[in-house]
């Protein structure tokens, strides 16, 4: 490969070498302070994310080591979930992880409230939003434990074909 960087196999699961190189160039452009990782502010410089109310949650999900920034490996692994070659299960798990803020494998009433609050802002009162959250939990919670498991989440979301919309063209 000469002077070109090689990447661990687990980083390349859904991208070919040309796509990795393009993502590498994009990462370098985004890394304004040349630190080797992307801060929230650097992520926000992406026009397609600037006005996304869930951008901080996306960054939290990408940031697998929890240091508050996204390094190149985390960037590749995170964006890989949006690859057209990515599978339905992986995309559903990513969508679930946006809501599962404490990473315990369940979406609690409080987590659903927080994420929906990010999306609706002040368009609903907290009382209205809580009513929506409570109804959603009642409908999706098939085993009656008061929270939504991945299986309960995916049973509903799979039918909406969300995985077909979670695509990034590299």
From Swiss-Prot:
It is found in: Mitochondrion. InterPro entries: EF-hand-dom_pair (IPR011992), EF_Hand_1_Ca_BS (IPR018247), EF_hand_dom (IPR002048). Pfam families: EF-hand_7. A lipid is attached at residue 2 (N-myristoyl glycine). The keyword Cytoplasm does not apply. One of its GO terms (molecular function) is calcium-dependent protein serine/threonine phosphatase regulator activity. This is Calcineurin subunit B type 2.
């Amino acid at each position: 490969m000469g002077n070109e960087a090689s990447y661990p196999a687990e980083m390349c699961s859904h991208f070919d070498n040309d796509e990795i190189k393009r993502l590498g160039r994009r990462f370098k452009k985004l890394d304004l302070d040349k630190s080797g990782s992307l801060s929230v502010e650097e992520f926000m410089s992406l026009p397609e994310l600037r006005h996304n109310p869930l951008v901080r949650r996306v960054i939290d999900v990408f940031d697998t080591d929890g240091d508050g920034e996204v390094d190149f490996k985390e960037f590749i692994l995170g964006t890989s979930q949006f690859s057209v070659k990515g599978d339905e299960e992986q995309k559903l798990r990513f969508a679930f992880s946006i809501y599962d803020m404490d990473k315990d494998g369940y979406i609690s009433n409080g987590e659903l409230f927080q994420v929906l609050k990010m999306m609706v802002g002040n368009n609903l009162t907290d009382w209205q939003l809580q009513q929506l959250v409570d109804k959603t939990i009642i409908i999706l919670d098939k085993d009656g434990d008061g929270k939504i498991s991945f299986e309960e989440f995916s049973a509903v979301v799979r039918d909406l074909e969300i995985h077909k919309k979670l695509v990034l063209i590299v």
